[in-house]
């Protein structure tokens, strides 16, 4: 019978819809397993092939766990607030709510089309007022605990989205969402004090099973360092303070630099003789993003503050002060000391402005470049009492001296900044606060939540940078919940990251009207046992959700300090590059491609995009080859954690494998158990597939199944052999497996159970190695046949078995065996001569 994948997949998807085999049961006595993937943003384009990679992997893990006797929670939802939907709605003149529901409907269809074992009764949607009621409730708890505050500050402003971006949302000077340039603006913003949790966010990484690159990225982003704050005297009434991790280099300080935003500059306006020049520089710096002022800032610019003198506390010498935009007000004290002999950025600045360069750690040639050691073994020179010490010895010695002299003290510093939490857009959760002229900011009473996002006539962007909600005067104007006076609602909305910072908790108890999650459900399901997601979310969603979870732990909502016990990540799937030089034959054509597309022309695979025409739509793949083929290929494509390239030919190869499994059903004998001949390959494959799924080596698990099928075609197979194959293949290709399971009578054998409801096969270690082996027999180098002998038989046993062979006996008749060449378990060669 033909493998009609379309009919088979519809049949089983309809059945799963009816019987709900993926429903998780809170409080069940089975051990629990909570497997989580990052819920998708429901874009208008629908699923792309990047989605099925993590979704399929976690589905396989959860299916195996279910078969191993676990009560599995494998949920799905939609992270539906945010800029893309709003921008699409503005462009197409459709309300974002309508767009969102259309997109969710399409995503749901596609997810079910791929056969994912989600618990569809637990779906969450961040735009549902019954969901964001609790997002607002959590924000109010943050506000009540002084972890949410409003302040005027320089912020990242996307010139296209016309809204504020968090530092984490700016990538290489542009908006990570739309790619438009990001500039700096002064705006009043709601902030969350994530910095209060900086130490715990770093220290608690030791208690979780995250892949190392995730831990490293989070540690680097938080950027904790222990150093020294040093006070420098000036010729004004103000001292300045500098933070440094290399207090040992103080003798090498030849200048200082202040941030353009530092408040001291305004205070010194009457002292600075070239104020007009400084003010113009400040204005230019204000138009740049932090990235432009940092990583992109190759040319060192600045203005010397004429009239300001700074005294180096180590040497007593006067050094100049500059204002330069490479110093950011948000890190350290907003003032840095310049040690050009041992910092390349400082060296470049000193060269640009003709400043002295002093060597204080010997070993390099500071006339050519700064000398920067990667370790602390360098020897101090030109450093007074530190001379002759190693850097390792000099740092504590200088720190002790600075403390004793009263101009220094130890300080722990962080790169992490508080989270910019408000957005001047429409499509987000309303911030449930009211601004009263008498009472200040007052929370909306909890019993009035959710504060529902109102319908607006125009949700398009305002040129003045205010939220579209600001035009809704009937909604904005309200009464103060505290004193009853006239007041105004906050019109900014929450960022997209708000709803995703706690969604994993709502999955545990999605229909609870009284609290975000009950203690019963959270105690049972928490923490998430395995969370897989993209590396691009490591310093955004993953960090934010850990922060919110720790806060919820502090106020008694959850019982675990960390939300996720395990975190893994997956590689991106690339598309074929239509502009690759390998696609053309002549050098002239290759040169033309390089001239037009640069380095991109040298890469055979690139990120999929509509403009390149290399986007792969899962709908098309499923229509042509079936959902099981799509699932199988997306796992067979390569190392799960690394980038992989889509190949239509390789998809066809996975379809051929499933065809072979389908056709293999006709060759199954009535022998019920695992056959003796296939026992080694069956038990070895069970061991391999079990271990590989647990370690995300899905491609090698599939390769092992393919090898086993090859053996079955060579050896023949029993019902027991086929049963083992179907059970192992079930997580990868569930539709086809259930059809074969039913057709071959296994469902009847197990009282109507589907394959997915049966126990995962177990292996016997002793049977993973064959008890006998087939060996080739040669007589004087000529092949005479094969023999079956026990594994690791000695030479005498092998020779006797060979001599018992009819062909060998005939070949050595009348001959004398003068030598035996024995390759254990492989070959025996009898060297003979006439008697």
What are these regions (language model features)?
Residues 24-94, 100, 123-138, 244-245, ...:
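N-terminal catalytic cores of NTP/NDP-binding nucleotidyl/phosphoryl-transfer enzymes
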Residues 79, 144-145, 149-156, 410-441, ...:
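Helix-rich, typically C-terminal accessory recognition domains appended to large enzymatic cores
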Residues 2, 11, 18-19, 91-248, ...:
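Residue patterns forming the tRNA-binding/recognition surfaces of aminoacyl-tRNA synthetases
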Residues 214-241, 288-317, 321, 419, ...:
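Flexible, glycine/threonine-enriched loop-and-boundary segments that flank and lead into catalytic domains
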Residues 3-13, 49, 135-362, 468, ...:
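NTP-handling and nucleic-acid-processing catalytic cores
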Residues 1-36, 66-75, 99-106, 279-323, ...:
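Conserved oxyanion/phosphate-binding beta-strand-loop segments in alpha/beta enzyme cores
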Residues 3, 224-229, 237, 362-365, ...:
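Long, charged, mostly alpha-helical binding arms that flank functional sites
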Residues 1-32, 259-262, 271-275, 355-372, ...:
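Basic, alpha-helical terminal appendages of large translation-related enzymes
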